[in-house]
Regions:
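Class I SAM-dependent methyltransferase SAM/SAH-binding core
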Residues: 78, 84-86, 90-136
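Class I SAM-dependent methyltransferase Rossmann-like catalytic core
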Residues: 34, 38-68
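C-terminal alpha-helical "lid/dimerization" subdomain adjacent to the S-adenosyl-L-methionine
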Residues: 180-227
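Conserved beta-strand signature within the Rossmann-like core of class I S-adenosyl-L-methionine
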Residues: 171-180
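A short, conserved alpha-helix within the catalytic core of class I
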Residues: 155-166
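A conserved beta-strand element that flanks and buttresses the S-adenosyl-L-methionine
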Residues: 147
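N-terminal, positively charged/glycine-rich alpha-helical extensions of SAM-dependent methyltransferases
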Residues: 13-46
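Conserved Class I S-adenosyl-L-methionine
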Residues: 213, 217-248, 252
Length: 252
């Protein structure tokens, strides 16, 4: 499939082949652990929204929704591991601006996080929040667009393959999976940011663990192929991000 210029390049980032992935399934990120709504969790989710806005996640999603969601269309979308729902709200804002109609399922397995997301989305009736495990989520129908942002590194290699398989199965038209790209730049950048700006204990712990757990460029490519992805595109983006995607011209 022909690559389209979206501001990224196909080469893996410097150092991505040197830093080994560290993943212990027994060590959960703090935000993934069972917990009630708390000031600490709200602060952590606020920091994640800021990081998404300033350091590339929103930019990546915006690039693709502008291509995939056109004026006047109606689309069903699912955002897997949605967190507090900032990406669904971003998509709804775009759809409203261009006169498109979207229905978005925002899925997460953390009930307290979903409670916060629902409160933040009170003016967004287009978004429905559902508590479910990605690997056990079996809706009656698929979706036009399937999104999964900054979530794949939460899984073991084997479960990441299963997630990518599910993304592909759920999609009628488009799939976008984006995440950090492991390497020295990611490690240094995250350590600096969490030392100087995002210093809350939960954010600092989770961000540094995420940098260690992220997949390299080559690893994500291999996981996608093991997950049955064919004719997919794969690029790196600014701020040590990478994304893989499938479009309707590709075999889903």
């Amino acid at each position: 499939m022909t690559q389209r210029p979206l501001g990224g390049s196909r080469e893996p980032p410097l150092g991505s082949r040197i830093v080994k992935r560290k993943f212990d399934p027994a060590e959960l990120e703090l935000m993934d652990r069972p917990q009630p709504v708390s000031p600490e969790l709200e602060q952590d989710l606020r920091s994640i929204r800021q990081l998404n806005r300033w350091f590339g996640s929103h930019r990546i999603v915006r690039c693709f929704v502008r291509r995939w969601i056109k004026p006047g269309v109606r689309m069903r979308i699912v955002d897997l591991a949605t967190g507090s729902g900032d990406i669904p709200r971003l998509i709804v804002d775009h759809a409203r601006q261009i006169g498109a109609r979207v229905e978005i399922v925002a899925l997460d397995q953390q009930s307290a996080t979903l409670e916060i997301g629902r409160k933040l989305s009170s003016d967004y009736p287009e978004i429905s929040f559902i508590e479910a495990d990605i690997l056990e989520f079996k809706p009656p129908d698929g979706y036009d667009i399937v999104l999964c942002s900054l979530a794949l590194h939460h899984f073991s290699d084997e479960d990441a393959v299963r997630v990518l398989w599910r993304c592909r199965e759920l999609a009628h038209k488009f799939v976008l999976v984006s995440d950090l790209c492991r390497g020295w730049l990611a490690t240094i950048g995250v350590n600096v940011l969490t030392a100087l700006i995002f210093r809350a204990p939960m954010t600092r712990f989770d961000a540094r663990l995420s940098a260690e757990r992220a997949f390299s460029f080559a690893e994500l490519d291999d996981l996608a192929r093991r997950g049955g992805w064919q004719n997919f595109c794969h690029k790196k983006f600014r701020f040590v991000r990478q994304a893989i995607w499938l479009e309707k011209t590709a075999k889903l």
